[in-house]
Amino acid sequence: YVLSKEEKRMTQMKTSKTLLITLLMLMALALMAAPLWAQDEAELAKKLQNPIASLISVPLQSNWDFGRGPENAMRYTLNIQPVIPISISNDWNVIIRQIVPVIYAEGPVKGLDDRTGLGDIVQSFFFSPKAPTSGGWIWGAGPVFLYPSGTDGLSARKWGAGPTAVVLKQESGWTYGLLANHIWSFSGPGQQDVNATFLQPFVGFTTKTYTTFTLNTESTYDWENSEWRVPVNLMVAQLLKIGGMPIQFQVGGRWFAEKPEGEADWGLRFAVTFLFPK
């Protein structure tokens, strides 16, 4: 017996709901039982809100997007996002951030097969001063690269590069800022060039029990097709220690304020971040 697309969707939604409820219960228990952590844990929670903090981390971010095409298809993306800071002088770091997507996409129209595989890798290099500015601002800038690592049907099949930058400020538990990049393709057999701007304004608040509430958008403007894709994400995260290792769990939802025709309407997110403080 082969499950229909509707039965698959219902099963996936039930699984997602169970996952969300379980995580929320774990967070509630952690909040009720959380002991006072030392100052270094408070600093760790703060660094988690900083995309260019000097902190080795491995986030595993799962995204379920629903409502694609006339078949209301689902797309699942696991973003593997290791972050590696390197000290290059007494005053400067370079922060290397990768996004390695693993994708399962149902066919959004009848007759189009489901696809599973690797997406194109994006790698960013942020050169950042170790100390904030006199006004408390943290910033970094450098190049970003697009590698055509994806499997057929999930890749632009283009090499790309461009500039990237981030600026943020942290005060009284609040973190706010903007991460941006622009990628132009310069080689590759893909039929359509890549010419895209990515904008991620973000604001977050971390409580004294290391619970973080975050609101952001992950907006992309495709200059080739004159199209916006604007998911608005609302997320809650909890920092815990499990077996002595600091781990952050995050859950959230998103709504697409603007999107190309046939793209998803809404989605869910669950992420686990493994931290390796020095």
Predicted regions and their residues:
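Short, Lys/Arg-enriched N-terminal segments with co-localized hydrophobic residues
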Residues: 1-12
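Bacterial N-terminal signal peptides that target proteins for export
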Residues: 10-23
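Transmembrane beta-barrel domains of Gram-negative outer membranes and organellar outer membranes
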Residues: 38-278
